[in-house]
């Protein structure tokens, strides 16, 4: 991988990680179109450290309050004594499913499921589910039924959104796409679903990145150029990722996810067309 390729893929990671269009799919599609090698699951996981940093910086005040509240609650023997402490435990609970399924299907995630057939199916499939979810949400709003805020997320919501996050292990699904969809199905507002989605990503993204760093440490240390490429891609992903978070949070306050639904379907169909014509290999 050249430095230019690493920079482009880092920018792509930052642009697509937080939008419900799947960063993994784009990191697989763009190299295929450009004639580059597949960067691999390890590259994807490690570069997510950049977008992880973006979440930490953007939500730094929320995260500090949550950590302080959790520690304070444990010291007082009242772990759920404040909304911030409760949110900390909801994030922990929502992380359990992806840890279980991630370890169980690790080999398939890194090999079979990276096929462009799987990716296109996931892009189109989740788009249809998200569309049905938006229809349901609009009907609920039309009936003036209330939507839940972040503070109303309980054990049920946390675990079910965590299960939705596990679906994102299939490349093309989109972590933010599955978790926001899960949140909307559980009657969260779009903004609340997005904010919880981003906070929920912290433990699993950090764990996946650290695991891949550990497993690839020898090859990284043996190749300074590869290490440099990863560093450049990670920094680019972080800078662009921060802007993507700010955009999506603001966008969802006033708009639906329709534009992302259309985009997913167009890209999914385009991939199948390119494979059929032999322009790219699955």
From Swiss-Prot:
Pfam families: BacA. Its EC number is 3.6.1.27. The keyword Transmembrane applies. GO terms for molecular function: undecaprenyl-diphosphatase activity. GO terms for cellular component: plasma membrane. It is found in: Cell inner membrane. It catalyses: di-trans,octa-cis-undecaprenyl diphosphate + H2O = di-trans,octa-cis-undecaprenyl phosphate + phosphate + H(+). GO terms for biological process: cell wall organization; peptidoglycan biosynthetic process; regulation of cell shape; response to antibiotic. The keyword Metal-binding does not apply. It comes from the Bacteria. Keywords: Antibiotic resistance, Cell inner membrane, Cell membrane, Cell shape, Cell wall biogenesis/degradation, Hydrolase, Membrane, Peptidoglycan synthesis, Transmembrane, Transmembrane helix. InterPro entries: UppP. It is a multi-pass membrane protein. Belongs to the UppP family. Catalyzes the dephosphorylation of undecaprenyl diphosphate (UPP). Confers resistance to bacitracin. PANTHER family: UNDECAPRENYL-DIPHOSPHATASE (PTHR30622:SF4). HAMAP family: Undec_diphosphatase (MF_01006). NCBIfam families: undec_PP_bacA. Bacitracin is thought to be involved in the inhibition of peptidoglycan synthesis by sequestering undecaprenyl diphosphate, thereby reducing the pool of lipid carrier available. This is Undecaprenyl-diphosphatase. It comes from Chlorobium chlorochromatii (strain CaD3).
């Amino acid at each position: 991988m050249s430095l230019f390729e690493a920079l482009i893929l880092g920018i792509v990671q930052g642009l697509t990680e937080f939008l419900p269009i799947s960063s993994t799919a784009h990191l697989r599609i763009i190299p295929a179109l450009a004639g580059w090698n597949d960067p691999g699951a390890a590259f994807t996981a490690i570069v997510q450290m950049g977008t992880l940093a973006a979440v930490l910086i953007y939500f730094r005040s929320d995260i500090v309050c949550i950590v302080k509240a959790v520690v304070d609650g444990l010291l007082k023997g009242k772990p759920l004594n404040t909304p911030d402490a409760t949110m900390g435990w909801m994030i922990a609970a929502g992380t359990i499913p992806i840890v279980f399924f991630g370890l169980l299907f690790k080999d398939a995630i890194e090999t079979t499921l990276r096929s462009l057939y799987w990716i296109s199916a996931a892009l189109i499939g989740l788009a249809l589910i998200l569309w049905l979810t938006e229809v349901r949400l609009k009907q609920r709003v039309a009936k003036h039924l209330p939507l839940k805020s972040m503070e109303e997320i309980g054990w049920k919501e946390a675990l079910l959104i965590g299960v939705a996050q596990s679906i994102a292990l299939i490349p093309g699904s989109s972590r933010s796409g599955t978790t926001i969809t899960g949140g909307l199905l559980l009657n969260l507002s779009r903004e609340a679903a997005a904010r919880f989605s981003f906070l929920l990503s912290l433990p699993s993204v950090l764990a996946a990145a650290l695991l891949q760093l550990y497993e690839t440490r020898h090859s990284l240390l043996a190749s300074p150029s590869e290490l440099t490429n990863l560093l450049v891609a990670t920094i680019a992903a972080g800078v662009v990722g921060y802007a993507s978070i700010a955009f999506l949070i603001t966008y969802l306050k006033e708009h639906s996810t329709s534009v992302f639904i259309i985009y997913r379907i167009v890209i999914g169909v385009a991939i199948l067309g390119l494979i059929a014509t032999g322009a790219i290999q699955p």
